[in-house]
Amino acid sequence: VLVIHATALVLLDSALPQLRDPEYGRRAAALRHRIAEHPGRPLVLVVGSSRTCMGLNPTAWEGVRPNGPDRADPLLFNMGLVGGGPIIELMALRRAHADGFRPDVVVFEFWPPFLREDGPFHEPARIDHNRLFKGDVPLVRSYFSDPAATEAQMRYDRLHPLYETRHRLLAQLAPRWQPWSRRMDLAWGGLDGWGWLPGVDEYPPKPVDRAARLAHCEPIYRGQFADYSVHPLADRALREAVGLARDKGAKVALAYLPESTEFRSWMTPEAERRAQEYLATLRRDLNVPVIDARLWMDDGYLVDGFHLSRQGSAEFTRRFGPAVAAAFPELGGRP
């Protein structure tokens, strides 16, 4: 039994990290293949939330990129994680560096709702302790509200690796055995080889279905915009992530992904003012370009007001690739 547990621990933490955190691990494995297939192209790692996961479809960029002889096109890869605000973005970047990836550009998603960290909006509460690696401990100590308790839980997880990860393992080995209401693989089961998570396959939109999604989301986000402010924890994590990317030699940009007319109407004037002032502060303090794609897409492509449909992701990415190239005209390929 001890040998079985020890073997499981090695697999979960080292040999097959996608077993512990398949959402990140599967993307990391896919990224290695894409880099091997496209040597010399400058790597652009895009990190963010489910909006990034479903919105950035690099295959669409591959179909239209210039592929000129005098300049290597950016190699876009989607390293988003569902629920990701600045802290999870920092976690993803730290993991990518620990796994040996050295992006030429890192694009961080900027989204005001995930810049709140107070009360129910505390981002670490969205991170399941079972998906944390030993290398995540510094992040836990810096940003979690009770790091000692989280570390204790991580140690317990490693003493009982099969039991504590049984649901996640089952979701990967036999997902159909899980009832739909308890499926865990929605964030990774459909990932393609470029890190894209296909969203709702709906365009043109079905008015009744789209209206129902908007009605479900509206009270949630109106609540997040009430008494809105950018939390110091989110600001610290975002600035640390930008600094880390630059320390490792990458250029950095921020991206504000598309929102529908309805979603923007849920944002109070005060929340809008504070978010725009904060974005301007980041642009000035950090000297970063901002790819403002907030108004790029017709409402019909946004199935719930803020997530792109599959068709919308393709249209968006065909425009996003050139925007990245324009933001970094000096970007060249590796020798």
Where are these regions (language model features)?
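Soluble non-cytosolic domains of exported or imported proteins
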Residues: 51, 55, 83-87, 101, ...
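Membrane-embedded segments
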Residues: 47, 51-143
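Histidine-centered active-site loop/cap adjacent to the catalytic His
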Residues: 304-335
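Loop/turn elements at helix/coil->beta-strand transitions in domains of secreted/extracellular proteins
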Residues: 41-43, 72-74, 101-105, 248-253, ...
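Membrane/wall-proximal cationic-aromatic binding patches
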Residues: 4-75, 91-95
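Secreted/periplasmic serine-hydrolase-like ester/acetyl group-modifying domain
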Residues: 123-248
